[in-house]
Each structure stands twice: as C-alpha cells, then as structure tokens.
Regions:
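His/Asp/Glu-rich metal-coordinating catalytic cores
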Residues: 2-28, 32, 39-177, 193
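A short, well-structured beta->alpha microelement
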Residues: 6-26, 79, 124, 214-250
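Binuclear metal-ion centers of metallo-dependent hydrolases, dominated by the metallo-beta-lactamase
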Residues: 131-134, 146-233, 302-332
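C-terminal regulatory/interaction regions
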Residues: 2-3, 11, 225-332
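Active-site metal-binding loops of divalent metal-dependent hydrolases
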Residues: 38, 61, 99-102, 121-123, ...
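Active-site-proximal loop/helix segment associated with metal-binding centers of metalloenzymes
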Residues: 97-110, 123, 128, 137-147, ...
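Active-site regions of enzymes building and remodeling cell-envelope glycoconjugates
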Residues: 31-38, 49-58, 71-83, 91-94, ...
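Short, well-ordered alpha-helical microsegments
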Residues: 43, 63, 105, 126-128, ...
Length: 332
C-alpha cells in the first residue's frame, strides 16, 4: 500500500495547516489551533481564533500568559498540554516537545500513520537546551537564514550580559529592555549567575513573572514598579528595572544605564549606543549555524522553510539543498 502523504500548506499568517485538521501558529476558521509561544508573529489573528477555532492548544504557561496579554479564551476551548503530552485530532497525533526560546515555547510533532512532521517553532541551543527531533518533514522558520547571520559568541552571551549589568550597577540603576518572555528568561539567567540586586518590573512584565513563578521559574526579589517597596528601592539607586523593548524608544530618564536586548548584532557580544545606552546581542533564536545544525541532525526527507517567518529563507533553502542534499520547499 502506498504511503498517504499528509497534505500540508502554509497560509498568509505563516500558519501551518496539516490535513485540513489542525493549524499551528496561524488562523483558519473552525480548525483547532496550536500556539507554540506568545510572541506576536506566532499569535497573528489569535482574536479570530478565540472566536472561531474549535480548540486552542499550547503549554499551560503559554495559555496563562496569553490571558495576561488580554486574550479572553473560553475554558471550553483551552487544551493545555505539557511537554511530552499528546492529543489526537482526527487521524493525527499532536505532541508538544520543549524548545529553548522563551519560557513555555514548544516544538510540535504531528504524527500520521506513516509520517512524522516536526515544526521547530523558534529555538536556540539545538542539541543542548533544544532537543533535535527526527522528522520525515521538518518545518522551520529560518529567522536568521542568511549565511552571514552568525553570532560566534552565543555560547557565552549569558555571562557577558550578567557581567555588563553587574559592572553598570556599580554606577547606578540599570534599565533593561526586552520582549515579553525574553525579560523573564533574562531575570532567570541573572539570578542563576548570582546577581542579587532587586528587580523592578513594569506592570505587564510583573504579572507575566508572577504567572511564570507558578510554573517553577525563580526570580528572587522583584517588585511592581508602582509599589511603595519599589519606590524605596529606587530611591536607593541599586536595582535592575525591566520593561518592554518598545519603551526604549522613549527618551530615557536621567538615571542610570540602559541596556537593549537584540539578536540583530553579529560582530560583537555588546556595543555602546550612546553615553549610557548599550545593546547586548542576546537572542532567543539560533543563528544561521544553529539552524543548519538542527536540520543536519534531524535528518529529514524534506525541509519546508516557512517564508512568512524567515529572513533570507531562499538562501537558507539553497544552502540546505546544496550542502546537505535534502529536498527543500519554500512555502507559501
């Protein structure tokens, strides 16, 4: 009997539709939707899904964080899946596996009777903190798909970031700007690296941290920016203040040093942007070599590069086809 290939497509949201049965990180009316994590490019049209999808599937942390971000998801539609837990939808088995990106991020494994499809979602540290999953078809977002997008310092960036913040704290408060989820990851890293200054958080970052603690993350001493305790701490001038990257566009106040977190820097681990402004090349995504390593070790029969969430997806696809000899499709 010939193998029945699952029908797969990618829509204009970057949503991955498999066998007209499920969509991952995108919206189609009535279809169950898997949400790999809370970043905006993966939750496009989520309000439509809250209204019209039959089910919303994700890790418990991701689903709780979405509520903090203002999505009112009816309990009847919520399907929390822990890592290594699965659910059957029609003839498909859906399994979530860990990805090292922001807390709660999942890779998605979809199994049919004779095919195994893996969507990596966003990841970094493949083979170390992100398990590399074998697949017949591997769907990947080539976020850093150009061969020049390499950060040789990725392996020690956590220490660089901690050392810089520690050094700047000696001169006064430090303001750190990052996306939702990335801030909580950095708080965790700083604590694990022994930084003990109090953390002060803007409202939404604070609520996200509170939820993450229920799921086992530990952030030590942190305070809501509007609390009386935070006022006292800020008067002392020894603290790290975390807020969303968007806030860095406003003129910083006269206090302290300001550190922006961004993966779009490939020459050095950190650089000075101004007298008290710094950029640290702290990324939540694997660089070009990390993407290649994942594909190489997963040994898929074919790779589908998700063009909607890739930068230089064509270059990445060409590299995989020529250097690794694997069949590649760029969709949509």
């Amino acid at each position: 009997v010939a193998e029945k290939q699952p029908v797969m497509s990618i829509n204009s949201d970057g949503g991955i539709i498999i066998d007209s049965t499920v969509i991952i990180d995108g919206h189609e009316d009535l279809l169950p939707r898997v949400i790999t994590h809370i970043h905006s490019d993966h939750i496009r049209r989520l309000r439509a899904s809250v209204q019209k999808s039959s089910l919303l599937i994700g890790t418990p942390l991701t689903l709780e964080w979405l509520k903090v971000l203002g999505f009112k998801i009816p309990d009847s539609k919520i399907v929390p899946l822990n890592y290594d837990q699965s659910i059957e939808l029609g003839e498909l088995k859906i399994l979530l596996r860990e990805a090292n990106h922001i807390p709660g991020t999942a890779q998605v494994v979809v199994e049919t009777t004779d095919q195994r499809i893996v969507y990596t979602s966003d990841f970094k540290k493949p083979g170390e903190r992100t398990p590399i999953l074998s697949a017949d078809t591997l769907v990947i977002d080539a976020v850093y798909g150009d061969p020049t997008f390499r950060r040789p310092f990725d392996d020690y960036i956590d220490e660089v970031l901690t050392d810089l913040i520690r050094e700047l704290l000696a001169k006064g408060p430090v303001y750190v700007y990052g996306y939702y989820g990335k801030v909580q990851e950095v708080m965790d890293i700083l604590r694990r690296n022994g930084l003990d200054a109090p953390f002060v958080l803007s409202h939404k970052q604070y609520v996200l941290a509170k939820v993450a603690e229920r799921f086992g993350m530990k952030f030590g001493d942190y305070l809501h920016a509007n609390s009386r305790e935070a006022e006292d701490v800020m008067r002392d001038g020894w603290y790290v203040y975390f807020t969303h990257l968007a806030a860095s566009r406003r003129t910083p106040n006269g206090l302290g040093n300001h550190v922006l977190l961004s993966g779009w820097e490939f020459n050095k681990p950190f650089k000075r942007l101004g007298s008290r402004r710094w950029l640290v090349a702290f990324s939540d995504h694997a660089d070009f070599m990390g993407l290649v390593r994942y594909v190489e070790d997963a040994k898929p029969e074919q790779v589908i590069v998700n063009a909607r969430r890739s930068t230089a997806g064509e270059k990445f696809g060409d590299y995989v086809a020529k250097k690794l000899g694997i069949k590649v499709k760029l969709l949509p």
